[in-house]
Amino acid sequence: MSEASDASATGELRLEPVQFIARTDAVMRLGSMMLGAGGSSARVRDSMERAAHALGIDELHTRVGMTDIVATTSRGPLFRTRVTEVRRPAVDADRLTALKRLTNDLRPGMTTVELQRALDAIAARPRRYPELLRLLGAAFACGAFALLGNG
């Protein structure tokens, strides 16, 4: 007997709020992408709130750190707490702008699939500049800042 049919036989699928979990995961993915692109904690929190509202989540409580997000979502009697870590945060203004535009366009009734597709499209966009050029630009900016500070 397969795992899926085992779950059906015991009624486990009825107990597991699959759609609610998918909504929570989509909200967390948006927050993680924003934090990973250099978004401020206030901007990340605001964008996650907008997404949660658009997807039909009643309440969202978040704690956004420098490299992690802890969020608890609730809808009726259901709740779910998720933790995500951004391992390599960087500043990517282009991605941040695309994510902010997406959150500004969110409307109540949006589906999880629609949000995930929009996030997939943003994630698939190539970076505007190659890594070597970004590295050289950062080195130049740091050097210029040191000169301005009499360093």
Whereabouts are the PLM-identified features?
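Core alpha-helical transmembrane segments of integral membrane proteins
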Residues: R128-G151
